[in-house]
């Protein structure tokens, strides 16, 4: 699956000082998506996309609008050829996935709630304290029956996002917080379907695919030493890019943070700060990102072809050549505006071949 986005007309009727630049971003995003789709098809990939309602308008919704169905990897997990979905994604993504094939709702064998903050938000008056939950979450007898059932239904984990996981042969690498690892002590047996794989948890800030990317057996692109590779990927060759991606766009990300909560919010389309934010992106950042920022959020088409949004990084190109991988340039101008790279905006649903143990 390749993501999709709102058409420029989605912002018809809004104040032009905000809607005009947003329309440009949407138009260029759709152009880049079409180019990406053609690249995928040229390599023999069957591509499906969420379908958009052409009559949908921003002003039709008086409340916060959901982001477009652009990043199908964020709330789905594909293991083998089984697609798990939390059901929290854009309705157009869920609908298209169900049309394509069976979508499986995750079933937890024990409650998994990964932080005290989330626990306090979802827990009822009859639930145990956070510390008692952490100590007893695998002991059903400790809980009232209805509390146990509620906790199972409200369970979630980073492994329910293919953006936080890498399925490499028979191993599933899951990026999660150090607090979650130390307090919850998650295990693959916590969820049906995951228990068939050797699950390895690694401390990670943000999505795994925005921090590092295994490009083929024995080779990894990485922004920094985000994990102890000698333990998780012993003997693999790692290309470190400590000054790329997020660190190169830090001033823009700071501006983006200031506008948190103003995304798709009715009444904010004429907000001067928001308008400045959008115009700053278009005026100062798009060309810079295209030309100088390398994003490890890449997509491997096969063992020898890697989709990249910046073909100009000499260090990366040398590393790819060393491992007999050819970069395939896919323009993706608004990656840091939408917060999704080439990997995030796709979701592998079916791959041929068999799973192997690459670490034996």
Predicted regions, residues:
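The feature marks the mature, well-folded catalytic cores of soluble enzymes
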Residues: 1-360
